[in-house]
Amino acid sequence: MIGRLRGTLAEKQPPHLIIDVNGVGYELEVPMTTLYRLPKVGEPVTVHTHLVVREDAHLLYGFAEKRERELFRELIRLNGVGPKLALALMSGLEVDELVRCVQAQDASVLVRVPGVGKKTAERLLVELKDRFKAWETSPAMFTLVSDGPLPVASESSAEADAVSALVSLGYKPQEASKAIAAIKDKAGLSSEELIRRSLKGMIAK
């Protein structure tokens, strides 16, 4: 089991990245909340990881904090929740926000995540309620990410990368494009910032 990687961030193509560890490039998929915290390409980075072994592939998932990894592991233990849906949930909501939704048994936020209907949301809340009783949360509510701007990038490529990342989470191309188009003053924003604002608009309403 690979539990942590420390190396140089070699590539960043949301939601995937490659970390160079002593000349070996490890490809990972990460939730958007982790992506926002990553350094620039070429800088040192450390991520906590979870390895999923399938017959046709070994898939590595990365997280900025151990707590995020533990949440991911709790989610994929649930019936009908695979890595893709777990990442979609974690990309739209910070750990504290998702835990509070479960503790309050509030399905209204969960149903805004692609792939989560009303029945699925209600089932997830019931199955996670006991597991999250001991989880502590900070007092702030719906602080999806900081409002500070992220690094500037080429507008056309940043928007294309953002749409691609949203589609990978389960949104339809039209929904993703519409969410990006609805962002005000988006000229020069990075793909990470575009993703952050679009998810905030679609989920944390």
Curated annotation (Swiss-Prot):
Keywords: Cytoplasm, DNA damage, DNA recombination, DNA repair, DNA-binding. GO terms for biological process: DNA recombination; DNA repair. Residues 1-64 are annotated as: Domain I. Residues 154-205 are annotated as: Domain III. GO terms for molecular function: ATP binding; four-way junction DNA binding; four-way junction helicase activity. Residues 144-154 are annotated as: Flexible linker. The keyword DNA-binding applies. Has three domains with a flexible linker between the domains II and III and assumes an 'L' shape. Domain III is highly mobile and contacts RuvB. Homotetramer. Forms an RuvA(8)-RuvB(12)-Holliday junction (HJ) complex. HJ DNA is sandwiched between 2 RuvA tetramers; dsDNA enters through RuvA and exits via RuvB. An RuvB hexamer assembles on each DNA strand where it exits the tetramer. Each RuvB hexamer is contacted by two RuvA subunits (via domain III) on 2 adjacent RuvB subunits; this complex drives branch migration. In the full resolvosome a probable DNA-RuvA(4)-RuvB(12)-RuvC(2) complex forms which resolves the HJ. The RuvA-RuvB-RuvC complex processes Holliday junction (HJ) DNA during genetic recombination and DNA repair, while the RuvA-RuvB complex plays an important role in the rescue of blocked DNA replication forks via replication fork reversal (RFR). RuvA specifically binds to HJ cruciform DNA, conferring on it an open structure. The RuvB hexamer acts as an ATP-dependent pump, pulling dsDNA into and through the RuvAB complex. HJ branch migration allows RuvC to scan DNA until it finds its consensus sequence, where it cleaves and resolves the cruciform DNA. This is Holliday junction branch migration complex subunit RuvA. It comes from Pseudomonas entomophila (strain L48). The lineage of its organism: Bacteria, Pseudomonadati, Pseudomonadota, Gammaproteobacteria, Pseudomonadales.
